Amino acid sequence: MRIISGKNRGRQITAPSSLPVRPTTDMSKESLFNILNNYFYFDRVVVLDLFAGTGNLTYEFASRGALSVTSVDNHQGCADFIRRTAGKLGYSQVSVIKADAFVFTKHCKQQFDIIFADPPYELADIEKIIDNVFEHNLLKPDGWLVMEHSKAHDFSQHPQFYQHRKYGKVNFTFLVNMTDNSDSSEEEEEDQEDGR
């Protein structure tokens, strides 16, 4: 995986092959951050990275100067790898929590500007993550929840739905903590996938 922008732009990170992960592709990650860049100043955001895996998104947010990034994964190997890598890269704003994302989002008391969730595509009931985020008020006003998912899921009828983007086999649904979603849109972008 590669850090696309920020102080560690171009840095390649190789995760152990033993980790049970499916990292977000560089192409889809770059497209995602191009969208976020239009709405957020990264040096002002507080981020939660759920199902963090190798920490791919965690490092990208940290490289771009995020105020803090909380990285949550239930796999000990993943949590240890993120902690080591963040330390090597000097990301003091990164905190790593080994926890089940469903349980964590039920009990977390902090609010975030951006929450990114990349559950395993085959995982059942991933909509519970969305429910937990909004029921437990984990987003700041105008904060965003970004769900990465397969085409099997459609969250366009959720009251906080904002937009949907597709890059190859990667789907992103954006949900926003706001009361007026009149500008919600469904956008499809078909691109070649470059691997995760």
Where are these regions (language model features)?
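Class I S-adenosyl-L-methionine-dependent methyltransferase catalytic core
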Residues: M1-R196
